[in-house]
């Protein structure tokens, strides 16, 4: 009698191998939670200690600002070892590795979304200083893309080897994964720096569609399921997109635009919402279109630093912005405003004993409120602010903001060589200030025309003919008295060339012996300006802080 051997039917996903990778996803998520809690705790301790003893703690600050390359290297090592754990024969278990990297990619999403959360006016928690997290978010996104790519390559190889690549690709649940993979491939291309900067709106749309698609579609695509991680991601994304937009935003209208034709800058005055909280100097807000405007959903909100301080007692927020920009403000539209968002750790304002600030172009909106804050306190702390512009017409903003004691450099080679071209020059024509609003009491200024010089990166890379600066007050634009030497007046207002840090930031009081642990250099502007200021601050032993608005 023939005995029929029982046929063992292997489960579709490989029996125990079907769920073998679940624990590795949980491990990645657990490490992500540890990462979040660790830096939350470090930031909280740093702020509290700094506040309580009035001393900047270098060790805690370094720990809180661990270099991105170091964190990403650590994550690469973690992913590499977890991705290859218990794999003995790559040629036989490559599909297990492919599955594992797909799960790793998805389980990293909660951390990556957390890094871009923007709670407003949150002084004790790491997300309150969300700008500190953006670099890590970018690189972690790239790491997730690589894990996704490994997952896709593994499966395409397997299906091609079996001769079923088309059949398997168009099975519904598999097809969902392919859709996400294609989106990631496109996102990687438009994320290339030159393309991202040129087509930022396109990049932003693809970025958001890819993010939402991955979170939602992979919930159905992944087997075993990743529902719990998907729910966490959706909660975080809904907070960012919906809660901040509908419950923590302020509708603003009747904006006032102060401008002159030849300037590269303009001032936007936004009526301060009645319940808008007090903000720290250097804080910024974000503007977006209202929810009824399609642009609100497909374009990013835009950050602008508040150039005035609460102590000014005015009922509006002043923004200094560069024109033309990707976000053109129309005074007749209503916008949604969120914020304020903090930039510098708030104990800085109670502990610094010497501050040197250098700003380029619209970066004046970051340095100026810090200067004016200390002036409002009648503080004896030595503080200097240097403002560098290429276009002399940009100085019209001095009639709109309190820029007393701001020292100004005109770095344009054209202006420098013409020294100069004074108001008495035959090429000089007065350019009246115009205000796009109904107010009649705005100041008027006469400023000189240039040949359309634009502010560019490398603002300070001009000839090193730096001239020691002198203070520049709002009164530096006086109405000319009859018989006044106009050429001399013009030269007194501006200095030309590149500022020499050793000269402009020289300590005026020879008896002053500053505590370098709480002495600061602050820079805001183009990359080259920031790099120069950082190098000088390190040479002198100062603490350094910089502000960039680019992604």
Swiss-Prot record:
Name all FAD-binding FR-type domain ranges.
Answer: 247-369
Q: How does it sit in the membrane?
A: Multi-pass membrane protein
> E.C. number, please?
1.16.1.-
Q: Which residues cross the membrane?
A: 25-45, 67-87, 100-117, 138-155, 172-192, 199-221, 225-247
Q: Name one GO molecular function term.
A: ferric-chelate reductase activity
Its GO biological process annotations read:
reductive iron assimilation
For bias type Basic and acidic residues, the affected ranges are 472-492
Q: Which PANTHER family match?
A: METALLOREDUCTASE AIM14-RELATED (PTHR11972:SF198), NADPH OXIDASE (PTHR11972)
What protein is this chain from? Probable metalloreductase AIM14
Gene name tied to this protein: AIM14
């Amino acid at each position: 009698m023939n005995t029929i051997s029982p046929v063992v039917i292997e489960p579709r996903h490989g029996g125990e191998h079907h769920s073998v990778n679940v624990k590795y996803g949980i491990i990645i998520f657990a490490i992500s939670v540890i990462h979040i809690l660790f830096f939350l705790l470090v930031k909280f301790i740093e702020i509290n200690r700094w506040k309580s003893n009035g001393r900047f703690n270098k060790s805690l600050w370094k720990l809180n600002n661990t270099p991105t390359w170091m964190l990403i290297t650590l994550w690469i090592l973690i992913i590499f070892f977890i991705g290859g754990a218990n794999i003995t024969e790559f040629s036989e278990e490559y599909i297990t590795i492919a599955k594992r990297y797909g799960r790793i990619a998805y389980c990293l999403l909660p951390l990556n979304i957390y890094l871009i959360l923007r709670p407003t006016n949150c002084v004790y928690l790491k997300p309150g200083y969300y700008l500190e997290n953006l670099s890590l978010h970018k690189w972690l996104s790239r790491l997730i893309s690589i894990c996704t790519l490994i997952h896709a390559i593994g499966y395409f190889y397997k299906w091609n080897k079996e001769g079923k690549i088309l059949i398997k690709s168009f099975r519904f649940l598999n097809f969902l994964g392919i859709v996400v993979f294609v989106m990631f491939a496109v996102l990687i291309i438009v994320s290339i720096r030159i393309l991202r900067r040129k087509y930022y709106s396109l990049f932003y749309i693809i970025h958001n569609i890819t993010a939402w698609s991955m979170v939602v579609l992979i919930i159905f695509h992944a087997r075993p399921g990743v529902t719990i991680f998907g729910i966490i991601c959706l909660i975080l994304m809904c907070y960012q997109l919906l809660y901040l937009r509908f419950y923590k935003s302020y509708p603003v209208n009747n904006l006032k635009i102060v401008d002159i034709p030849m300037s590269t800058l303009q001032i936007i005055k936004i009526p301060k919402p009645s319940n808008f909280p007090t903000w720290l100097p250097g804080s910024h807000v974000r503007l977006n279109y209202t929810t009824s405007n399609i642009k609100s959903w497909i374009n990013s909100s835009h950050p602008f630093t508040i150039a005035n301080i609460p102590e000014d007692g005015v009922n509006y927020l002043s923004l200094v912005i560069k024109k033309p920009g990707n976000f053109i403000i129309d005074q007749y539209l209503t916008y949604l405003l969120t914020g304020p968002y903090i930039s510098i750790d708030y104990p800085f304002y109670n502990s610094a004993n010497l501050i040197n600030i250098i700003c380029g172009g619209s970066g004046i909106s970051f340095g100026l409120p810090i200067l004016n804050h200390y002036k409002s306190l009648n503080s004896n702390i030595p503080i200097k602010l240097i403002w560098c512009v290429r276009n002399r017409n940009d100085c019209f903003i001095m009639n709109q903001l309190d820029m007393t004691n701001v020292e100004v450099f005109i770095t344009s080679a054209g202006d420098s060589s013409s020294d100069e071209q004074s108001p008495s020059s035959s090429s000089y024509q007065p350019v009246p200030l115009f205000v796009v609003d109904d107010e009649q009491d705005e100041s008027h200024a006469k400023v000189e025309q240039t040949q359309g010089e634009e502010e560019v990166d490398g603002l300070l890379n001009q000839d090193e003919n730096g001239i020691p600066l002198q203070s520049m007050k709002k009164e530096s634009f006086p109405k000319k008295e009859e018989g006044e030497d106009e050429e001399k007046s013009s030269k007194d207002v501006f200095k030309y060339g590149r500022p020499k840090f050793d000269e402009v930031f020289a300590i005026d009081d020879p008896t002053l012996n500053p505590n370098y642990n709480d002495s600061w250099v602050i820079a805001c502007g183009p990359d080259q300006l920031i790099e120069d200021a950082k190098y000088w601050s390190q040479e002198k032993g100062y603490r350094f802080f910089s502000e960039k608005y680019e992604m």
